Amino acid sequence: GVVIDIGEGVSKVRESDKVILTWIRSDGAECAGAKYQKGNTIINSGPITTFNNFTVVSENRCVKLPEGIPMDLAPLLGCAIPTGAGIIFNTIKPKHNNTLAVFGLGGIGLSAIMAANALECSTIIAVDIEDHKLKTAKELGATHLINNRDGGALDEILKF
């Protein structure tokens, strides 16, 4: 998004800066998540308040968008990539000869595929019900594809 206005003490971003909102805390001020009210319903929108046209966020949830990265790809940097790649690099930590299966090939799953490929996992199994997502997974490093539209993915995976 684009910074419309800043509050007192904000030094990390300026008005008109292009930014990525992320759930990963960085430096800068932290404040409570925003709340919105519609009639008698109060919505706690959390620390980054996504899916809005405008939002109020803590400075430490904004990262300036690096030059050369298009705005339409920026949202992937705030959630899908750190979640999908983060689970591979920081939690699973597979070795190059490990087999890994990823179920669901949205932004998070495809980011996990890319991370597993970067770690040179020998077998990366992509599972989804959409052929176009499986094709993308193959392009990003999946070694085996399973369309689970009719079930049976687990039986297929156990063959590896």
Language-model regions, residue ranges each:
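Glycine-rich beta-strand-centered segment in the early N-terminal region that forms part
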Residues: 1-28, 66-69
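Adenosine-nucleotide cofactor-binding segment
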Residues: 99-105, 117-160
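Short, well-ordered alpha-helices that flank and scaffold nucleotide-derived cofactor binding pockets
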Residues: 89-90, 114-118
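Hydrophobic packing within well-folded, soluble alpha/beta domains
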Residues: 1-3, 13, 55, 65, ...
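NAD(P)H dinucleotide-binding glycine-rich loop of Rossmann-like/cofactor-binding domains
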Residues: 25-103
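Hydrophobic/small residue at the entry helix of a nucleotide-binding pocket
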Residues: 83, 108, 116
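Conserved sugar-transfer catalytic core signal across GT-A, GT-B, and GT-C glycosyltransferases
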Residues: 87, 112, 133
